[in-house]
Amino acid sequence: MVKFDRICMALVCMVCSLNVSADDLKLWYSRPATVWTEALPLGNSRLGVMVYGGAGSEELQLNEETVWGGGPHRNDNPKALAALPQIRQLVFEGRYREAQEMVAQNFETPRNGMPYQTIGSLMLDFPGHEKATDYYRDLDIERAIATTRYKVGEVTYNREVFTSFVDNVIIVRLTANKQGTLSFTASYKSPLQHEVRKSGKRLVLIGKGTEHEGVPGAIRVETQTEVKNEGGHVVVTGENIQVNGADAVTLYISAATNFVNYKDVSGDAHRKSKAYLDIACKKKYEQAREEHIAYYQNQFNRVKLDLGTSEEAKRETHLRVKHFNEGKDVSLATLMFQYGRYLLISSSQPGGQPANLQGIWNDKLLAPWDGKYTVNINLEMNYWPAEVTNLSETHLPLMQMLKELSETGRETARTMYGCDGWVLHHNTDIWRCTGLVDKAFWGMWPNGGAWLCQHLWQHYLFTGNKAFLKEAYPIMKGASDFFLHFLVEHPKYGWMVTCPSNSPEHGPEGDEKKNAPSTVAGCTMDNQIVFDLFSNTLRACKILAEDAAYAEHLQKMIDRLPPMQIGRYNQLQEWLEDVDDPTSEHRHVSHLFGLYPGNQISPYTDPLLFQAAKNSLIYRGDQATGWSIGWKINLWARLLDGNRAFKIINNMLVLVEPANPSGRTYPNLFDAHPPFQIDGNFGYTAGVAEMLLQSHDNAIHLLPALPDAWRKGRIEGLVARGGFVTDMEWDGAQLSKVIIHARLGGNLRLRSYVPLKGKGLREAVGENKNPFFQVERIKEPLISKKICPQYPLLYRVYEYDVMTEPGKSYCFERI
């Protein structure tokens, strides 16, 4: 035992000293960006900047999280309520196209959400630098700093840019190795209606958000830039800032709007922008830089991943992507994993807005899909990595948004459906619209709020924060209240179902390309989401000792929901009827919600459903849009197939270039739908974590889906439900050592493909008594009489229990 304790102590020291080379966590290039998807993103959640790194002309494209078109508005259609009974009748009669036409006439409105918008850019023009040599630029995601370096003649010029988490401004540091050689002009360009003026030592841009779909532009934004020069002289005019003959220069850039909250735009953009800059300019550059790095690394350094490295890792980043499928650059998977964490830290901090389809980076007035919050998969995917990759605080902006949506969605539920509670359809914006967005084919899906409530419950399972659960419970209850009133008895089956609704962006006859209707009743995803919502609300009700009668009502409704069904192709049915097309490779795999991110399909308790879900995913194919690939990585991880998950990773890491515009990763590692959507980056990061650690199915499963390509490696800092922080080491594609750090204590149940030994370990027996680990009690699936059910082939697992105490660590190793 003494010897084993020494081994554990050595392992603790080994894990604590784990340090991936800084070069492995940099994106670097030997030429400036020429297009936006080559520029490098920096952000502090509120401010975003894309750094092009030009020598003769540098562009710093600017965003502020509250610069949106339009203003406070609603998009409820009061005609919906009267039309609802007839729409339901048409659906139940199988007249889906007629039902969808009625939805279009009575649910749609001219307002489909407002667009996220750019401020514009700050341009830095350097005369005579056009023919620079020895060029280099990078983004160091261990420090959240972008660097540009080059030579003009014998002079070496260097720029550092970061978006300070502490001072809430963008800071640019320019130096040269020869005194008096820094000369440039700074000016703004913007597609907004704007004006530029001088204000003391500052150059100020005042802009206005645009009108959109009849909603006047309510946002006013002010950007201020000030130069601190060392040597030389500075002239500020009404158009630009001119710097001549300086030794070094620091630029401070602030931006702020009049946005207060979704219903209040009475703020003072000038006062806020000025205040940020007043404070920031008092600090020396070195202090500001040090404080920024410390804040960022407090979050980023919690997780370290080492999958090995190779000579290929020395290539420029876009070339690494281009050659990834040759199979030699294993550490690119590490960089991409940590890049997702970097982007989440940079786009979602407490007190701010949630990351939208663009994160916070957008160079347009009309971004793809308006850069809004699409909630039939995309917004949820943005936050899949938050808890498991040890970034729980990045989840909080989404929680605040949910609180606000529960307020606006209450009016939508009453006006459009005559229901209690609150509802959200498939899209929203900064103004928290909750009515139907876009056409009926996409928009007739009232489950957005229900799905998002899963994030409230998962945050509780990972953190054990009962005070948070008490605040979240009214939101969950409100969403449940809506469905308790909205569900209707199916006249044929007797189940309680959603109607009207759809399986996102897909119908039994195809998608929008086939002009097919999507409006149906009780599709599988809806049933799974409502089951998830009711079950989690019921648990929260019991934990908080709330209304027992309400809990009983929830349970009765759970019992009346449809079961999952296995169809004639041995697939998990997408709809109530067995009408799935096995040749469809549609991007949405909505009926697999119960597999991931839900936990309703377990290989150990529901093997037939598990195999049916696998068959459905096989039918959908391995190619997809970027975000869909991100989802499929997670799904194959849940299916315990690491090699198939890695194959999907290979499909994502394909470079978008002129010769291959259908690639899935841009040169700056942004995910490509195409075009850019940030959810694919977050889906990838969550998927890698899911391959290495799972905790949804009654135990912590160690290395559940490790691919052969990652035969040796180490991970530190992943978090399991119940607050168990997990460090692992493996070789030969098998777990060798693990340390568990217990934040909350309680029973720790481990699941492993190899037998383990360690102090306090005992063979697991019976149900896991830790309340943060749950097993869903689902109905027995209905199975088509046309098939012989298939059972999955599963690896043998070993399960152990050990009782833990808060704040203590526990070491185990392979026998």
Where on the chain are the PLM-derived regions?
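Bacterial N-terminal signal peptides that target proteins for export
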Residues: M1-M9
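Aromatic-residue-lined binding/catalytic grooves and analogous aromatic/hydrophobic interfacial grooves
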Residues: D23-F441, L456-Y460, K477-S480, F531-F534, ...
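Alpha-helix capping and helix-loop boundary segments enriched in small/acidic/polar residues
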Residues: G327, W369-Y373, A386, L436-N447, ...
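C-terminal catalytic domain of Rieske-type non-heme iron oxygenases
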Residues: G359, D363, M496-T498, H506, ...
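Well-ordered alpha-helical segments within folded domains of soluble proteins
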Residues: I377-E387, P446-W457, M525-S535, S590-N599, ...
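Acidic/histidine-rich catalytic neighborhood
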Residues: G478, F482-A540
